[in-house]
Regions:
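Zinc-dependent metallohydrolase catalytic domains
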Residues: 1-94
Length: 94
């Protein structure tokens, strides 16, 4: 996600992304990521997938945005909000 976000900003070539439907470019980027992981699955199918698939279920993959500082800035996420993760707890790989 971090690499995709950096690539997105490189594609803007230093220009600001236009606001569309009152959403900034960064907000649209993160919303698109979340929508990509939307899913609806029955409990039995989820249990079977957890037992056989090496990948985490979609609801856990979508929450990786909590580790990206830009997500907090894009949505003005505050410390008292449910998805807030303190900066010293955010995972940084690159």
């Amino acid at each position: 996600l971090t690499a995709a976000y950096a690539a997105y900003h490189l594609s803007l070539d230093g220009k600001p992304a236009p606001a569309i439907d009152n959403l900034t470019g960064d907000q649209r980027f993160f919303l698109a990521f979340g929508q990509d992981w939307r899913s609806k699955i029955r409990d039995a199918a989820l249990r079977q997938r957890i037992a056989t698939d090496v990948h985490a279920p979609a609801q856990f993959r979508a929450q990786t945005v909590r580790n990206i500082d830009a997500w907090y800035a894009a949505f003005d996420v505050k410390a008292d909000e449910k998805l807030y993760l303190a900066p010293d707890q955010r995972v940084k790989i690159w």
